[in-house]
Amino acid sequence: MKVKICGITDMETAKRACEYGADALGFVFAESKRKITPGLAKEIIQELPANVLKIGVFVNESVEVIQKITENCGLTHVQLHGGEDNHQIRRLNIPSIKSLGVTSESDMKNAQGYETDYILFDSPKEKFHGGNGKTFSWELLAHMPKELREKAILAGGLNTLNIEEAIRTVRPYMVDVSSGVETEGKKDVEKIKQFIIKAKECSK
């Protein structure tokens, strides 16, 4: 099971997450309490192992801005949380992830229409896109077609207490956590370590 730690804002957390076995780190460039500047993201990314995915999170940003930040920071993928369509995805020409809030099984069917490398299934958006600590009914994704499952990333309120059930129900390619590894709104490296251990153990 691949694990993504999202909402990285400092070097120490990024390095520790990689040491503990994170496969991907997310850097939020959209409005969020976890927003990071491109300059700081670049500094962190330059110090990370080559095999770790560096994912930039954007919401309804212009193609030009996304391309510029991707190139300057050394991102490997972009995660799109707004109303982006396949026309914009093709124009970007960057490995991409489309995030979709899940409220019914039809959201899973809609996901198959996106021309992205991965689909991130999240809880429906609130004030900010993603990172709100809320789960959704994983049963809605239980009967996902194999070709979609192979590129599915599960997010939304995951933590060490529910990750086993989430993986067993959805069987995604990757799981994504942000608020579930925080204490008082800050990333907690011990929680990151335990989450990664649990996710990788329960998927063996």
Swiss-Prot record:
Q: Which CDD domains match?
A: PRAI
The EC number on file is 5.3.1.24
Pathway linked to the protein:
Amino-acid biosynthesis; L-tryptophan biosynthesis; L-tryptophan from chorismate: step 3/5
Is the rRNA-binding keyword given for this protein?
Answer: no
Pfam families assigned: PRAI
HAMAP family annotated for this entry?
Answer: PRAI
What is the protein name stated in its UniProt record?
A: N-(5'-phosphoribosyl)anthranilate isomerase
Q: Which gene encodes it?
A: trpF
